[in-house]
Amino acid sequence: MNKVASLGDIVSGDELNSVKLSRITNLSQSNLWKTLNGKVPMTFAKLVKILSGLNSEEEKMEVVQEFLKHTDKEADIRIAMYYLYLSGYTELLHGLVEKEYKQSVTNNYRDIFRVCLDRQTHSLRSGAFLKEIESLRTQVNLNKTGVNILINTLIIYGYFDLGAYNVLTVLQGMIQEKINEMPRGLEKTLNESELNIICAYAYLMQDEVKMARESLQKVLEKQEIPRLLKATALSIFAESYIFCEPDKALHFFELSLSELRKLKNNKSLLKRKLVENTTAFCCIIHNIPVKLEYIHDDAEIALQCIRQNKNSEACKILNQISNRTAIQDFYLSIATNDEGLRRKAYHRFLKDGNLFYIKIFDILK
């Protein structure tokens, strides 16, 4: 793929040397330069390794887009779909899922990522999303390892939307078994990293903090994972310290935000708002000064009012929220001094299996 030889356009001359790029990519200097000079075929996995040492996300995606314009190798296209999905570049992914491919397995990937895009754009949530996945299961070839892993991973997301974190214990082993069958390479790394992030979040919600951090550490050790995945791992790592070490939590939240600020796609902007809002939550419950631009949800605005003894203002905000979550009901119970509502909110936390954030009841009286 000769177009990628233009890598020199996005790396300054003193950075583009065989020793540095070889170290970044784990490719031999000979293999690296033969690839860049077109003597050895460029693969998507190799391209990602080369680009992983560069800071400009926008320029990385320009090179990725150029690569995809000039390749018809479907193995590369399948991995590219997955990488773009995890990176949050939905526009580039849209371009790939609108095409018809020669290989049925590539069309299976295409159909799976169409559903992924529907979920990301909120047109499919909870029960409807699970129904769509169950329908998809009957249409794709589950004997293909990559297809099997993606489908079962999506099922976990569907149950998580419903708060059923315990379903992980059933599916995790099944998915990991299939991942173990995958050949070593970028797709396996992405599969393992996504599963570890899912596991980490489920462990955290069940208050298995040590296991959550161990899963996240495995993700953060991987160099070629998308920046959005790294930022997500850092944000969950930060969450694990919210109640015990707020200073450490804020440190990791800022690391996550520094990664997210380098991204310009819609998914990263939504993630950034979520991380900023969780940072604000951490600050407010520990009476640490908070940046007002970090508060994006009415619930956190109400919580700040409560901490400032402005309960009537908090009540006004919370009463305007329809279908309040358990934590929003809890805030309202504090603002109104309603012990019955507090008990109701507590039981909703238990029912949802959220054993981590239930600690908020001991902090806010």
Locate each region found by the language model.
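Tandem amphipathic alpha-helical repeat scaffolds
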Residues: 76-86, 109-124, 149-164, 191-206, ...
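Ankyrin-repeat and related helical/solenoid repeat scaffolds used for protein-protein interactions
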Residues: 319-345
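Structural signature of alpha-solenoid helical repeat junctions
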Residues: 72, 106, 145-147, 184-191, ...
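Helix-turn-helix repeat elements of alpha-solenoid scaffolds
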Residues: 82-96, 119-137, 160-179, 203-218, ...
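Flexible inter-repeat linkers and adjacent short helices
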Residues: 1-155, 160, 301, 310-317, ...
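Flexible helix-coil transition and linker loops at the boundaries of alpha-helical arrays
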Residues: 97-107, 136-148, 178-189, 221-230, ...
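TPR-adjacent "capping" and linker segments in tetratricopeptide-repeat scaffold/adaptor proteins
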Residues: 63-74, 101, 186-187, 283-295, ...
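Alpha-helical scaffold segments of alpha-solenoid architecture
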Residues: 206, 214-319, 323, 327, ...
